[in-house]
Design a protein with these regions (language model features):
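Short beta->alpha connector loops at strand-helix junctions that form conserved
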Residues: 80, 101-104
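Conserved N-terminal beta1-alpha1 strand-loop-helix module at the mouth
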Residues: 1-74, 85-86, 90-93, 107, ...
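Short hydrophobic/aromatic-enriched beta-strand-loop microsegments
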Residues: 97-102, 123-125
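A short, small-residue-rich loop immediately preceding and capping a beta-strand
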Residues: 74-76, 80
């Protein structure tokens, strides 16, 4: 029988951490909520609308990722704005246990295999955004 796991998703927008309900921000829930409920994994998504992963706003994201990874004992899966193997390397060095590829996997499907070969298949997750009509 499969074990049930509780996984929560947190969003970061320009350095502000929040949780969403039905894709709408709900600022009442933060990392304290995550610790309180003893989740099994945290998914951290940077939804900042920047064109380049290296922009200054990403420094806030890296800092928050480091902060969360130092103060949390659950695996961190991180995504948002990943466009290259270098981006993946930066996230893994800053505390991510796994990374999420979304748009990059559509634009360049080879990045999935390259990332799995470089960093291990256990840390590569591909997500698909779907909306029912």
């Amino acid at each position: 029988m499969l074990t049930k796991r509780i996984i929560t998703t947190l969003m970061l927008n320009n350095g502000t951490l929040f949780r969403t309900k039905n894709f709408k921000p709900d600022y009442r829930f933060t990392l304290n909520f995550v610790d309180m409920w003893s989740v099994d994994e945290v998914i951290l998504i940077d939804i900042t609308r920047d064109l380049e992963f290296k922009d200054d706003s990403k420094k806030k994201f890296f800092q928050e990722l480091l902060n969360i990874s130092k103060n949390s004992y659950v695996p961190l899966t991180v995504g948002g704005g990943i466009r290259s193997l270098k981006d993946i390397e930066i996230l893994l060095k800053n505390g991510a246990d796994k990374i999420i590829l979304n748009t990059a996997s559509l634009k360049d499907p080879k990045i999935i295999q390259l990332a799995a070969k470089e960093f291990g298949s256990q840390c590569v997750v591909v997500s698909v955004d779907a909306k029912l009509k």
